[in-house]
Amino acid sequence: MRATGSVASRCRRKRILKQAKGFWGDRKGHFRQSRSSVMRAMAFNYMHRKDRKGDFRSLWIARLNVASRINGLSYSRLINGLKCAGIDLNRKMLSEMAIHNPTGFAEVANQAKKALEANL
C-alpha cells in the first residue's frame, strides 16, 4: 500500500485554515489562499510585536515631556537631572507616576532640578 501522509497533510491544512478564521472570502476557506494570507499575517504580527516596544517608549517619552514641562523642565533636562541625582527610574515607571501620582512626580522633578543646579 502506498503511504500518502494523509494524516499529517490534513493536520497541516486544518491548522492553516484554523489560523485563517475571520479572513474574508476565499482566504478563509481555501487552503492555497489561506496559506499565503496566514504567512503574510504572521509576518506582520512578528514585525509589529517588535514595533510595539518602540511605540510604547515613544508614548512614555511624550507623557514625560508634558509632565516635566508642567513642573518647569524639558524632557531632556528632566532625564539629565535624574541621572545627576542618581535616581534610577525608567521611563515607564516615571510615566505611570506622572499619571497616577502627580505629586510624587513633582517631587522627583524637583530633585532633578536641584541636581541640575548643583551641577552648574
UniProtKB/Swiss-Prot annotation:
Gene Ontology BP terms: ribosomal large subunit assembly; translation
UniProt keyword annotations, A-Z:
Ribonucleoprotein, Ribosomal protein, RNA-binding, rRNA-binding
Any one GO cellular component localisation term in the record: ribonucleoprotein complex
In alphabetical order, the GO MF annotations are:
rRNA binding; structural constituent of ribosome
Judging by the UniProt lineage, the source's domain of life is: Bacteria
InterPro entries cross-referenced by the UniProt entry: Ribosomal_bL20, RIBOSOMAL_L20_CS, Ribosomal_protein_bL20_C
Tell me which Pfam families the record gives. Ribosomal_L20
- Relate the protein's function as given in its record: Binds directly to 23S ribosomal RNA and is necessary for the in vitro assembly process of the 50S ribosomal subunit. It is not involved in the protein synthesizing functions of that subunit.
User: What NCBIfam families does the record tag this protein with?
Assistant: rplT_bact
Family affiliation: Belongs to the bacterial ribosomal protein bL20 family.
Q: What is this protein called?
A: Large ribosomal subunit protein bL20
Lineage, broadest ranks: Bacteria, Pseudomonadati, Chlamydiota, Chlamydiia, Chlamydiales
